[in-house]
Amino acid sequence: MGAGEKMAKVENWIDEKNGFSRPIAGRLLTHCFVAMFLGFIGGFVWLIALADNVFHILPLPRMEIQVPDQKELIRNAHTGTITNAMYVMAMVALSPWLRFSQRQAKWVYYGAITMLWGNIIGYSTAVFTPYRGIQPIFENDIANLFSYFTFYAAVIGAIITTGICLNNAIRAARTN
């Protein structure tokens, strides 16, 4: 049974408090912790770039490792990935107060995953293109193509998840 078939069988997207059910929250948090791990790897690459392509932690020998000369973009691959993971973790933690419907929980779940992985791929591939993945210039630049469209998908995911969470937060603020 594949992951899609397992997800199709999950009928309880929310728990009795209308937050994410434990299995759904666990799956979202798994994506978040994988993203955090990848963000930490980006941090090591950023440190190597800041140290002029030298990796030297005692007692290991000094090693020269070539990384792209895009320190700002490498930093973004580190901080952006971790920030997005924390944002999705906050959605999971706050879900009981946001009181999702079944439909909203599904939209937030898939939107959050799209946002998270779109940004991970976008930040990572933007390092290898002069256009940073923010301009639709695709001539002989597959990295920019990848980065641009994954950022585009991430924006759609962010709008969906943030919109639903904002709507439900406003609704919660208005209730007694």
In which residue ranges do the predicted regions lie?
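N-terminal amphipathic/basic-hydrophobic helices that include classical n-h-c signal peptides
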Residues: 1-8
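Juxtamembrane membrane-water interface segments of multi-pass membrane proteins
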Residues: 8-27, 46-71, 88-110, 128-137, ...
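Hydrophobic cores of alpha-helical transmembrane segments in multi-pass integral membrane proteins
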Residues: 28-51, 72-95, 110-127, 151-166
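Interfacial loop-to-transmembrane junctions
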Residues: 137-150
